[in-house]
């Protein structure tokens, strides 16, 4: 019988994030501002803390993951990896197809991985309140939970139709200081 589910031990949670830019033969074009010119790190500082800007513009292959972030990741990571045997058979491919199931996170998606890191770096920079937008609610719920873990007040603006249709996103209600529906 072929193995389908693969579970790594907590000891194998990565210690560094991999930055794909380091290995790209053609580097991505710079992000452009409203004036059509590349945005400088100084311009990014209006909405990002310095440590996140440094990562955004870095060409280093490996970026260390702070231990407080790794400690929180241990609550649900490593996420299980599954082999898609039936999809392989349906496609008739000799390739092995795997997928990682991120639904084991408290927010139910991969978005909490980034939210935890962003909340951590903002707290380290002295930020005590953050505001974000969310469409269907997963990002807003993720940042709200991350903010709660790091003592940051979070205000979430949510698309009105999702706000009305997704009352089950209770984690946002429990961990977010303020949720605001868009007017349309």
State where each predicted segment sits.
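PLP-dependent amino-acid enzyme catalytic core
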Residues: 1-179
